[in-house]
Amino acid sequence: MSLMIEGGRRLSGDLTVQGAKNSVLPILAACILSGDVCVLQRCPHLEDVDTSIDILRHLGCAVRWNGPDLEVDSSTLTRWDIPDRLMRRMRSSVVFLGAILARCGQAELSYPGGCAIGARPIDLHLSALRTLGACIREEGGRLDCTASGLAGAEIVLSIPSVGATENAMLAAIGAKGVTTVSCLLYTSPSPRDRTRSR
């Protein structure tokens, strides 16, 4: 594929940019933490957003569209579990784990699904949450998570993971103390530096 761009003409006009799916999904999970009304302007109306809305409603949140904007009221949150049928509809459903754990001190859910890329384990997510003090029991395809008190910690991911970082950040909001998230890949000294230190 190639593009040919002919310039020399002044550009003018207005363009309304819709929100991005990869940004809005963790923001929807973060709405849980506010305990109040959040408004997402120009929220994209996509299947994964609809699944997130279904999860929020299952948890007890009031969610409604107001034109292109989405309003989420999490003051009415009453549950901390996500059923398998909702978890399996999209890969990023696991990002709700950190937010629910921070808000409720417990969470019950199954492994996520919905990813056409193939199996991608969530061990980095679970490791990050355990580092913050969460107790996580994995049994029969379900995750039973409790946190009597999350504490700030230094989380070092073995490989880069946007989702695990998002989950750690959401859970860290409910933790006491400072949390830092880094990646071993970027924090390890280079081979040259290791040679110098010998």
Please provide the spans of the model-predicted regions.
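Alpha-helix C-terminal capping segments
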Residues: 30-34, 58, 99-103, 172-175
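Hydrophobic alpha-helical hairpins/lids featuring a short glycine-rich hinge
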Residues: 80-156
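Glycine-rich, N-terminal phosphate-binding loop and its surrounding beta-alpha-beta segment
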Residues: 41-112
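Self-splicing inteins and homing endonuclease
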Residues: 1-16, 53, 60-85, 134-158, ...
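N-terminal glycine-rich anion-binding loops that anchor highly charged ligand groups
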Residues: 2, 16-37, 64-67
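Single conserved hydrophobic/aromatic residue that forms the stacking wall/gate
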Residues: 186-198
